[in-house]
Structures are given as C-alpha cells and as structure tokens.
Regions:
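Active-site environment of divalent metal-dependent phosphoester hydrolases
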Residues: 13-15, 57-62, 84-92, 126-129, ...
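Binuclear metal-dependent phosphoesterase catalytic core
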Residues: 30, 35, 183, 205-270
Length: 270
C-alpha cells in the first residue's frame, strides 16, 4: 500500500526572525518533522514526503539552507515544489545535488510507486503571488499522464485551481486552471490533486477530480469570507495530510502537528 505525506507552506525565515513578526516557523517545522517521525510506527511504511511550496519566506539561499537543516532529521525521503514565496533559481541551486531536481526550466518532477505516480508541477510566477503553469509544465504533465496509461496519479502544485471565498487569496490562485483541466481530462486513471498556498484544509472538485488543499505547518490564513476582509494570519495549529491508496481509490487523512495525550482505551470496549 503506497502512502505519502504532504506538508506545505513552511515559510522558513532567517535565524532569529519571526515570519510576519509573529510566527516561529522554524520551530513549527521542527515539530512537524518530529510528529511525522513519531507517527511512523503507527502509520508506516510511508514512501515519501512532498512539500507543496513556500518552503521559505523570501527565497534566499540562507533560508533554503535552514529549511534543509530542519528537514535533515526527517526519517523519510522528501521532494519539494516552489510556491509564490520561493525563488526558482536559488531553490534549484539549493537542491542541485538531488537527482530529481531539473537542471533547467520549471521545477517539475515525477516519481512512480506501486499503486500510483506522483507528478510535481511548478506553478511559480516570478515576481507575482498568483500561479501559472508554463507551456513546458503543461507539456510535462501531459507526457507524464500519457505514459501512465490508466495508472492513478497524485498531481501536486502550490496554487489551488479554484476560488474558496477568501477574496485576498482567491486573487492569487492558479490563473490558467482551464489549461490544467484540459491536460487532466486526457488521463483515464484516477487523479488526486494536492495543493498548498491557503494554509487551510480545504477540499473541492476540479475537472472531475478531488483537489485537497493542505494546511500550513505553522499558521493559517484567516478564514474570513467578508467582502472587505484583508489578508491576515491566525495562529491555528499546524497540520499535514496523509494520502494513501486503499482498495481501489485514494484516501486522505488530516493529521495535526504536535504531541497530544493518549491513546486511551475506550471504556467498555474489548
């Protein structure tokens, strides 16, 4: 049974700094890694961790080095995708020793497992907050899905392809979603879309497939759907998603970050 864990929006800043003057994102990522390692005996084996963008706050080499240092304690392999806070070339350089990191062009990749493949797409628009899929990325996706036949696929990228009612964030979603839908429609197998960016657990249908948005590891985008709402964060607990193939379909679990009391046996249950 193939399983992957998704984390997103770690927003690592330089040592001694707080993201937005409020959030210790490094401590949150360290706790996320510890949570994953602690849960592995209960949920394993897990094949991969994917990070769906915004690894850093400013996309600097220093921040990528700090991200990698914090992830070094993870007991699983991981792959990353860029978000709007990342910068493509510093990110490429930071992961230059990884065989899966493209040497040129968009930061797209694919990995095949027994039950499904994972296709990672680069939705970064340099110098803008919204997402786009370059023609090279759309071609990469089309070729990847064509090569899979009817094998299921998880397709990961940073920017959600639909609006969620948080107006400031909806303006920053994936702007060429129709092109993505066209590429997905050509695949005969099951597809699960996984994104980040919104720092909340949100699920919706897109092009006939379930799209699951991952919460951030350290803070949430405030759930405020009023027309005049600004863009703000709320210090809600961090979370992650466990995606697995079970029987004949994808299943996703929401896992909070942290250590909690328990487990306690249910009274009267043998």
């Amino acid at each position: 049974m193939t399983k992957i864990i998704q984390i997103s929006d770690t927003h690592i800043v330089p040592e001694g700094a707080l993201a937005y003057g409020q959030v210790d994102t490094a401590a949150a990522l360290a706790e996320t890694v510890a949570t994953i390692n602690r849960l592995l005996p209960q949920i394993g084996p897990v094949d991969l961790v994917i990070v769906t963008g915004d690894l850093t706050e400013h996309g600097t080499p220093e921040e990528y080095d700090r991200f990698k240092m914090l992830m070094a304690d993870l007991d699983l392999p991981y792959r990353v995708l860029p978000g709007n806070h990342d910068r493509r070339e510093p990110m490429r350089e930071s992961f230059a020793d990884a065989q899966w990191m493209p040497r040129t062009g968009p930061l797209d990749w694919q990995i095949d497992f027994e039950d499904f493949a994972v296709v990672g797409l680069d939705s970064l628009t340099e110098s803008a907050a919204h997402g786009t899929l370059e023609p090279a990325t759309l071609s990469f996706l089309t070729d990847a899905l064509s090569g899979l036949g009817d094998k299921p696929a998880i397709v990961g990228f940073h920017h959600p392809p639909f609006a969620v009612g948080i107006r400031a964030m909806d303006a920053q979603n994936l702007h060429d979603a129709d092109s993505l839908g066209t590429a997905l429609s050509l695949h005969s197998g099951q597809v699960r879309l996984v994104c980040g960016h919104l720092h909340r657990s949100i699920a919706g249908l897109f092009s006939g497939s379930l799209c699951q948005v991952c919460p951030g590891t350290s803070h949430a985008v405030t759930l405020d759907q009023r027309a005049n709402a600004g863009n703000s964060l709320t210090k809600e607990p961090g979370g992650m998603l466990l995606h697995e193939w079970r029987d004949d379909g994808f299943l996703t679990h929401l896992i909070p970050v942290g250590a909690f009391p328990g487990p306690y046996p249910f009274l009267g249950v043998s």
